[in-house]
Regions:
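Terminal low-complexity segments of carbohydrate-biosynthetic enzymes
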Residues: 166-183
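Acidic donor-binding segment of Leloir-type glycosyltransferases
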Residues: 1-4
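Acidic metal-phosphate-binding loop of nucleotide-sugar-dependent transferases
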Residues: 35-37
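Acceptor/aglycone-binding surface of glycosyltransferases and processive sugar-polymer synthases
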Residues: 7-22, 27, 40-121, 147-165
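DNA-recognition element of transcription regulators
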Residues: 125
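Short linear elements at protein peripheries
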Residues: 104, 111-112, 129, 180-183
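Catalytic donor-sugar/metal-binding loop of nucleotide-sugar-dependent glycosyltransferases
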Residues: 93-94, 116-119, 128-146
């Protein structure tokens, strides 16, 4: 069953926030519709989150020994790995694929992550960073990925890099403020 909702604002982040607010389901799975994500992994996500009710999210990684990645352009792969490893170091995290869109979340956890400040692809960085920095329970599982099968990418690295940097600093400052508040 597919439902279409009118998005009151422009942007991917706003569209995802609208869907989170309108959803009545327990879990929300976010993935790209270019068929690069292996839809069989949705079952792995769901089974993982159902087995452990404490989990707020299951974060997929394309970069574990059990993942299979094909047709990833070299420059894009290199920049992706570089960025994700820098993020991993900055946030002292065990997760290595923050920029990947394909994840599953408990809806009630997503509601607590609102508002979403990202308007574009950087929303896929914002959500897992908030999961990690706010100490929600998550599990990392290997997923498969193959290059885009349909459509044309709207991702422009020069335009998007500043948005990703903004999101990174936003979440870093939030982490610092949350840590001070807990003391």
């Amino acid at each position: 069953l597919i439902k279409v909702y009118k998005n009151p604002k422009k942007g991917l982040g706003s569209a995802i926030e609208t869907r989170i607010k309108k959803s009545k389901k327990i879990y929300t799975c976010i993935f790209m519709c270019d068929l690069s994500d292996d839809t069989n992994d949705i079952v792995k996500y769901y089974n993982t989150v159902k087995r452990n009710k404490k989990l707020d999210a299951v974060l997929g990684t394309r970069f574990s020994k059990d993942s299979k990645v094909t047709n990833y352009p070299f420059l894009k792969l290199f920049l992706n790995r570089l960025a994700n490893n820098i993020i991993k170091l900055i946030f002292f995290s065990d997760y290595n694929d923050f920029t990947n869109a394909f994840k599953i979340y408990k809806r009630k956890t997503l509601i607590k992550l609102l508002p979403i400040v990202s308007e574009n692809f950087n929303v896929f960085l914002e959500l897992p960073l908030k999961i990690v920095t706010r100490n929600y329970f998550y599990k990392i599982i290997p997923i498969n990925w193959s290059g885009r099968k349909i459509g044309v990418s709207k991702f422009k690295i020069k335009e998007m890099s500043s948005m990703y940097i903004f999101t990174l600093f936003y979440c870093l400052f939030e982490k610092i403020l949350l840590n001070k508040k807990r003391r």
